[in-house]
Amino acid sequence: MFTLTSYFGFLLAALTITSALFIGLNKIRLI
């Protein structure tokens, strides 16, 4: 169960980083 929790935590971190980069690119395009 610990490995499953860490796996979901890794997915959440990856999703957050990806969304942050996507928003950053959109802001750069708007400028």
Swiss-Prot record:
<dbReference type="GO" id="GO:0015979">
    <property type="term" value="P:photosynthesis"/>
</dbReference>
<keyword id="KW-0934">Plastid</keyword>
<keyword id="KW-0813">Transport</keyword>
<dbReference type="GO" id="GO:0009535">
    <property type="term" value="C:chloroplast thylakoid membrane"/>
</dbReference>
<keyword id="KW-0793">Thylakoid</keyword>
<comment type="function">
    <text>Component of the cytochrome b6-f complex, which mediates electron transfer between photosystem II (PSII) and photosystem I (PSI), cyclic electron flow around PSI, and state transitions. PetL is important for photoautotrophic growth as well as for electron transfer efficiency and stability of the cytochrome b6-f complex.</text>
</comment>
<protein>
    <recommendedName>
        <fullName>Cytochrome b6-f complex subunit 6</fullName>
    </recommendedName>
</protein>
<keyword id="KW-0472">Membrane</keyword>
<keyword id="KW-0249">Electron transport</keyword>
<dbReference type="InterPro" id="IPR007802">
    <property type="entry name" value="Cyt_b6/f_cplx_su6"/>
</dbReference>
<comment type="similarity">
    <text>Belongs to the PetL family.</text>
</comment>
<comment type="subunit">
    <text>The 4 large subunits of the cytochrome b6-f complex are cytochrome b6, subunit IV (17 kDa polypeptide, PetD), cytochrome f and the Rieske protein, while the 4 small subunits are PetG, PetL, PetM and PetN. The complex functions as a dimer.</text>
</comment>
<feature type="transmembrane region" description="Helical">
    <location>
        <begin position="4"/>
        <end position="26"/>
    </location>
</feature>
<dbReference type="Pfam" id="PF05115">
    <property type="entry name" value="PetL"/>
</dbReference>
<dbReference type="GO" id="GO:0009512">
    <property type="term" value="C:cytochrome b6f complex"/>
</dbReference>
<dbReference type="GO" id="GO:0045158">
    <property type="term" value="F:electron transporter, transferring electrons within cytochrome b6/f complex of photosystem II activity"/>
</dbReference>
<keyword id="KW-0150">Chloroplast</keyword>
<keyword id="KW-1133">Transmembrane helix</keyword>
<keyword id="KW-0602">Photosynthesis</keyword>
<keyword id="KW-0812">Transmembrane</keyword>
